[in-house]
């Protein structure tokens, strides 16, 4: 999860693409994430997925380990934060395909990203992932 310090802390959150998410907003955004391949280091997977889903090379710098959270679906999400200043207008998301209305179609992995205050990010994020914001603020305060 990229973060930046402007007048105040901001974090970059992503809205999932595709028709299943088109009319869902608050509580449905996410950190950029994905699957860890067998034998892959989880941090390397996070960097790979970040690039696959946004087209941006994962930011360099010190990655803060934010631990893990468990989603209602039972999936475990591992989180890291790294300081970066990315322009949402430069988003060029990867695509996935699915059958929709009887035919296979392609949709963006992420349809938009936004810089948000921690409070706004917690409102937008999947509730379990809001914990990453709290952990980031604690890590930056230390």
Identify the residue ranges that each predicted region occupies:
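Active-site-adjacent beta-strand/loop module that shapes the phosphate/pyrophosphate-binding cleft
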Residues: 68-103, 114, 136, 140
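N-terminal strand-loop-strand
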Residues: 1-31, 80
């Amino acid at each position: 999860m990229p973060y930046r310090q402007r007048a105040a802390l901001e974090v970059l959150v992503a809205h999932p693409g595709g028709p299943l998410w088109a009319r869902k907003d608050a509580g449905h955004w996410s950190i950029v994430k994905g699957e860890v391949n067998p034998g892959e280091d989880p941090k390397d997977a996070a960097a790979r997925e970040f690039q696959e889903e946004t087209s941006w090379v994962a930011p360099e710098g010190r990655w803060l380990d934010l631990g893990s959270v468990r989603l209602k679906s039972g999936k475990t999400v591992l989180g890291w934060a790294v300081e970066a200043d990315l322009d949402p207008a430069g988003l060029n998301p990867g695509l996935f395909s699915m059958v929709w209305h009887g035919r296979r179609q392609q949709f963006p992995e992420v349809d938009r990203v936004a810089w948000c205050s921690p409070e706004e990010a917690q409102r937008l994020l999947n509730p379990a992932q809001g914990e990453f914001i709290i952990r980031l603020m604690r890590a930056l305060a230390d």
